[in-house]
Curated annotation (Swiss-Prot), chain A:
Protein family: Belongs to the metallo-dependent hydrolases superfamily. Adenosine and AMP deaminases family. Adenine deaminase type 2 subfamily.
Keywords: Cytoplasm, Hydrolase, Metal-binding, Nucleotide metabolism, Nucleus, Zinc
Localization terms from the record: Cytoplasm; Nucleus
Name the UniProt record assigns to this protein: Adenine deaminase
Gene: AAH1
Length: 355, 600
């Protein structure tokens, strides 16, 4: 399927290109190696049918049948995370890995309800992630934002309780953003208006985003913008089906956080080449390229960039545009954005020979 | 035994014209048409080409429904009862016979909307309505559209031609003449009612529509209590269908504890899920059909959706669904609250759309109240987050929650209270009109017409306001109450279910303008005069355009309003809206407005 070869020069360029990640579930970075370590450390008993070795689990991860199949493993994976250190370690191993891939800024998701339902407090989970974020800033100069996601398949009342329990974390700005994930179609955005309004009432600076338009039709995207008042859409691939929406996304600079490898793994499209990336570029709809649940979907952020290159080719100028719109669409302060933008120019200038 | 058919003369003797005229109000339009085709006597008496009395009766039956709070009750004391649209048409079209006024109302009227355009609530989007021009839109450097600032016609069915370009139906050989009485009633709009986030629109055929992606805007209404959920027939059908295939399971739910084998019984089997699934893909065909039917849009307009009762989907197997059930319920009235609405059907059954999860109307049951055949519902009214209806011989009935529906039938009990001493059927204490506010607060006036009553926190009390003349009609929103006397009208603010006495204001436009109807949105008001003119005032938030007075700059430069905060405009005095026609009905939603406008 690959049409364009990722030469060493291309790979080096895309590695060095400053990247921002806006769509990454920390729970989705749990590699089989760490999973089995935690099983041992925490004395967790896995179901009898669960694979016994790292390699067997890798084989399963490479062969998900669909979203449901993936989620079954995903939620078992979550069960091995118990202490603050576990959460720290999970996020820290992600940052270590991507620090060599040119990642400069990360806005990462986590699902408190996957943990609070197991009796682990929101504070423990958040503290672990927060520590890893601070360390990433310190050691790798990766700036970060923490986004708490609500699980849309859970009852709305439970999501409200989650928001309420996060009040002090939202007020103090430890949680920078609110998101919404899990099965989209049966649980439309209008169910969560009150959750979003409540969260925003805690802190006017709270940023809002939500998964929409992955499985659901474009009206899910429109309603997410109108009703939840988000400034960003996670996934949003299916927006392309609605010309009016495309105009709106471009005009209001609503960034879509696309996840190419995830879309293929979960059979949203058969191949990365089928994604409407060129159409988004042509219509000036800003998007960023992200890894979603990289441990499960066979590739971290750089791999996603490389896969997209192999299907679309694209010149240095287009990649610079993607890097810039990812920075512009980030929630970091103007000074940080300026730093990153000048880094983009430096890298682009450095690869003089690349078309 | 052989019966002899009575002659025309015999019928005339037993049913003289004055008797027939007296019973006309009790017949449906269709009954009257059938009667007119019975024999020569009735055919001559009920002369569709000449009888103004007949057409007046048909007009009132079709367009003057008194089931909602737009009109007061018809009572012995209201001698010359006229609905708002009758009053307006008689004033604006003096000397025109009722057959022509009927046709005017039916064929030359259209729904216009303006204000906040979010999620299609106006019944159109920026690109779906060719009648929307750039000068009708409040935009920020052409990127963000805040709203529509002038009344714009909603695209409705076969009428691709805007109303101003349409032929008059009574003075030419228009084909519409053919379908005049028994034909297509879907084009003719009887009522429009504004909710917090949408409009509900009722056609002469009894079909109910709602604009936009959601009527509730994500807020819960006076439906099931927190934490309770209705039984969802279509979802249940999907679930049982999926259960019949052992390897397939429905929407997942995380449960159990760490390592609990229940959570994932056999991962190797679930890996084969897709295979099993695809072999039986056609099991979804009937369901998809049912799902399509259950969310039907207006032909040619995706922003207007048909609203159906839940009870028609009472089938366990989608194959058993009888498509003709769709038209089995005919609605005659609709009233809207902030994030809910009520509709009454021609059998006097009441349906409620009252929450985020309620896509189809739940039929309400009032346990222990007498049967509708003896004690019908005479008027329905939605408040902000509650409802009030008037039942003959029972009185005012209020509620703000209900049981959940449990089975396929789609019924639920309302958690209602009857306001004491409101059930008189005649005399000075008979209720003349009422208006529903929020949290089960209800304002009402009686035949005696001198006291305003407030039922709130389960206590009735009377409110003394310095109002001149007899009170004949009340209307309310979340924060405003309007009181009509025989001569004028007043508004007063409501705070925490109490009247703020010092805010009593007489609505005065000019001495010769008489207001006959008022409606309030979150921050704006609309008034309708007896000559079909429309006036608006209040706050236009965030450039939403709900006043319909044009662009913010022109409102301010004309002196009608002033800027308030960043992007809001305050218009203090009721200001006339340019509509180029005769307005016969108005409604204010949350941040949007609607009207039915006739263009000659």
């Amino acid at each position: 399927m690959a049409k364009f070869e990722c030469t060493d020069e291309v790979t080096n360029f895309l590695t060095e290109l400053p990247k921002c990640e806006h769509h990454l579930h920390l729970e989705g970075t749990l590699e089989p190696e760490l999973l089995f370590q935690l099983v041992e450390r925490n004395g967790v008993q896995l179901p009898g049918t669960f694979p016994k070795t790292v390699n067997e689990l890798h084989v399963i991860y490479n062969n998900f049948a669909d979203l449901q199949d993936f989620l079954n493993y995903y939620y078992i994976g979550c069960n091995v995370l118990l202490s603050e250190d576990d959460f720290f370690e999970l996020a820290w191993s992600y940052f270590k890995r991507v620090s060599t891939q040119g990642l400069r800024h990360a806005e990462v998701f986590y699902d408190p309800q996957s943990h609070t339902s197991r009796g682990i407090s929101l504070e423990v989970v958040t503290k672990g992630f927060e520590r890893a974020c601070a360390k990433a800033q310190e050691e790798f100069n990766i700036s970060t934002k923490l986004i708490m996601c609500l699980l849309r398949h859970c009852p709305v009342e439970e999501c409200m309780d989650t928001v309420k329990s996060a009040k002090s974390l939202i007020e103090s700005g430890v949680i920078d953003g609110l998101g919404l994930d899990s099965s989209e179609r049966p649980f439309p955005p209008e169910l969560f208006v009150e959750c979003y309004q409540l969260a925003k009432s805690y802190n006017k600076e709270l940023q809002l985003t939500a998964h929409a338009g992955e499985e659901g039709d474009p009206s899910f995207v429109t309603n997410t913008l109108d009703l939840l008042e988000t400034t960003r859409i996670d996934h949003g691939v299916r927006s392309i089906e609605d010309a009016e929406l495309i105009k709106r996304l471009a005009a209001q600079k609503v960034m879509l956080t696309l996840c190419p490898l995830s879309n293929v793994k979960l059979q949203v499209v058969k191949d990365v080449s089928e994604l409407p990336l060129q159409e988004f570029l042509d219509n000036d709809v800003p998007f960023s390229i992200n890894s979603d649940d990289p441990a499960y979907f066979g590739g971290y952020i750089l791999q996603n960039y490389l896969e997209v290159y192999s299907r679309f080719g694209w010149s240095k100028a287009v990649w610079a545009k993607i890097a810039r719109q990812s920075i512009e669409g980030s929630w970091c302060d103007p000074k940080r954005k300026q730093e990153l933008l000048s880094e983009v120019s430096e890298v682009v200038n450095k690869y003089v020979n690349l078309p | 035994m052989k019966s002899e058919a009575p002659t025309s003369n015999e019928i005339k003797e037993s049913l003289p014209p004055d008797i027939v005229q007296t019973i006309l109000p009790y017949l449906t339009s269709k009954d009257i048409k059938n009667l007119s085709l019975t024999n020569k006597y009735f055919n001559k008496l009920l002369d569709y080409s000449n009888s103004s009395i007949l057409w007046h009766e048909l007009f009132r039956k079709s367009f003057g429904n008194t089931y909602t709070n737009d009109e007061p009750f018809i009572s012995k004391n209201s001698k010359r009862f006229q609905t708002c649209s009758e009053t307006i048409l008689l004033n604006t079209h003096p000397g025109i016979e009722w057959d022509k006024l009927y046709n005017l109302r039916k064929y030359r009227s259209a729904v216009f909307t303006w204000g906040c355009i979010k999620h299609g609530r106006l019944g159109y989007t920026i690109s779906s309505n060719s009648r929307l021009s750039a000068d009708s839109m409040n935009q920020l450097d052409r990127r963000i559209t805040f709203g529509v600032c002038k009344p714009v016609e909603v695209p409705w069915m076969l009428y691709s031609v805007p109303i101003s370009g349409r032929a008059n139906s009574w003075d030419d050989d228009d084909t519409e003449e053919e379908t005049n009485i028994l034909g297509e009633y879907d084009r003719s709009i009887v009522q429009i009612s504004g909710g917090g986030f949408s409009f509900q629109i009722l056609t002469q055929s009894g079909k109910l529509y709602s604009t936009g992606a959601t009527y509730h805007g994500g807020h819960n209404g006076p439906g099931p209590l927190a934490g309770e959920h209705d039984f969802q027939p279509i979802d249940e059908t999907i679930r049982s269908l999926e259960r019949s295939f052992p390897l397939v399971h429905g929407p997942f739910r995380v449960m159990g504890s760490i390592g609990d084998p229940i959570r994932i019984q056999n991962p190797h089997h679930t890996t084969n899920l897709t295979g099993t699934f695809q072999q039986h893909e056609d099991i979804y065909a009937d369901l998809m059909k049912l799902s399509d039917i259950s969310s039907k849009c207006l032909p040619g307009n995706d922003q207007v959706r048909r609203m159906l009762p839940k009870s028609i989907f009472n089938v366990k197997d989608p194959k058993d669904f009888d498509e003709s059930m769709i038209d089995s319920v005919r609605f005659v009235a609709v009233s809207s609250g902030r994030s809910h609405f009520l509709a009454l059907d021609d059998k006097n059954d009441l349906y409620s759309w009252d929450g985020r999860e309620v896509n189809h109307g739940v039929k309400l049951i009032f346990n222990d109240l007498p049967m509708r055949s003896t004690n019908p519902i005479l008027k329905i009214s939605c408040g902000w987050n509650c409802n009030c209806i008037f039942i003959y011989g029972v009185g005012l009935v209020v509620w703000k929650s209900r049981d959940t529906t449990v089975g396929f039938d789609g019924f639920a009990n309302a958690h209602y209270k009857v306001i004491p001493n409101t059930g008189e059927v005649n005399g000075a204490n008979k209720i003349v009109d009422f208006a529903c506010g929020s949290d089960n607060a209800v304002f009402y006036i009686t035949n005696e017409g001198e006291k305003l009553w407030l039922y709130s926190n389960e206590i009735e009390k009377y409110i003394d306001l310095p109002i001149e003349g007899k009170m004949v009609k009340v209307q309310a929103s979340n924060n405003t109450l309007a009181i009509f006397t025989s001569d004028t009208c007043y508004t007063v603010e409501i705070k925490d279910s109490e009247v703020a006495h010092n805010t009593l204001t007489k609505i005065e436009i000019t001495p010769n303008v008489k207001i006959i109807s008022l409606s309030f949105g979150d921050y704006h008001g609309i008034a309708l005069s007896d000559t079909g003119d429309m006036y608006t005032w209040g706050l236009e938030s965030e450039m939403c355009g709900c006043l319909g007075l044009g662009k913010p700059e022109s409102i301010v430069s004309s002196g009608a309003g002033t800027f308030e905060r960043a992007r809001s405009i305050r218009v203090q005095r009721p200001t006339k809206v340019d509509i180029d026609g005769t307005c016969v009905a108005i409604t204010a939603g949350g941040w949007q407005s609607g009207a039915i406008i006739i263009k000659d």
